[in-house]
Amino acid sequence: MENNHHLAKDSLDELNPKRGKGEHETQVSQYTVVEEATIPQSLVKTSRPADHKVMEASKVADTRTAWSTKIPAVLLPVFVINIALFKYLVFANFSTKDRVLFGLGNGGINIFSMWLLLATYETWFRSIKEVIVACGAGIRSFPQKRGVNMLYAILKLTFVNAFAIPLLMFFRSHFEQWRLGCPLVERVIGVMLNVAYFIIEIENPGLFTRVFNKYCDCLFAIRDILNRN
């Protein structure tokens, strides 16, 4: 047995002349450990294909991102056109001073939201909502910064004003007691509410979305009740 052991050592030394005596023993022991730790291929699990729902969600996200690249180019001319169309409608009874004060407040975004008032039918309203949500999703894909959250807040604030304006006009025309008696005070309050909204939305993104969805559902319910009567 000892002769066989010496012969094995000599043969290994001949194959590796640069190695010193006894180094092959360490190599053999390391090799043996590796062999013992080898995992059979039959036990290795292959990666599963992506779930169908996950793939569909990724497609929707890609579609929203694609929409977000087109929306700004479309909304800019629409914004300018609607300012021209609704200028006389909104400012019909306003003096020059009132126009300036109203414009310095939130007149610009309210004029744009007048275009959304044309969404009389629920199907068209839903499509506009989807476009704005898609645009917001594209904005949200950018790094989260305060300015980015403000852009998204502007989108949703525009949508809210689209319903706040007709409700305000309705109360003013049918219920005189709802008027404060001072248009300037009313506009200042409106600006303060918008500023408060910005603070809430920027500091707590997503909070307003849930309230906004409930708000839209209530508006649709009120509309259905009025249509039945």
Curated annotation (Swiss-Prot):
Endoplasmic reticulum recorded as keyword: yes
Compartment(s) of residence: Endoplasmic reticulum membrane
Ranges where the record places region Disordered: 1-27
Transmembrane domains' residue ranges: 71-91, 100-120, 151-171, 188-208
Keywords annotated in UniProt: Endoplasmic reticulum, Membrane, Transmembrane, Transmembrane helix
Primary location recorded for the protein, binned into one broad class: endoplasmic reticulum
Bias (Basic and acidic residues): 1-26
Family the entry assigns: Belongs to the WTF family.
Gene Ontology terms describing biological process: meiotic drive
One cellular component term from this protein's GO annotations in UniProt: endoplasmic reticulum
Organism: Schizosaccharomyces pombe (strain 972 / ATCC 24843)
More details: Although the gene is capable of encoding two isoforms, RNA sequencing data show no evidence of alternative transcripts.
Disruption phenotype: Simultaneous knockout of wtf15 results in normal vegetative cell population growth. Simultaneous knockout of wtf15, wtf11 and wtf7 results in normal spore viability.
Function: May act in meiotic drive.
Lineage of producing organism: Eukaryota, Fungi, Dikarya, Ascomycota, Taphrinomycotina
Protein name: Wtf element wtf14
Topology of the protein relative to the lipid bilayer: Multi-pass membrane protein
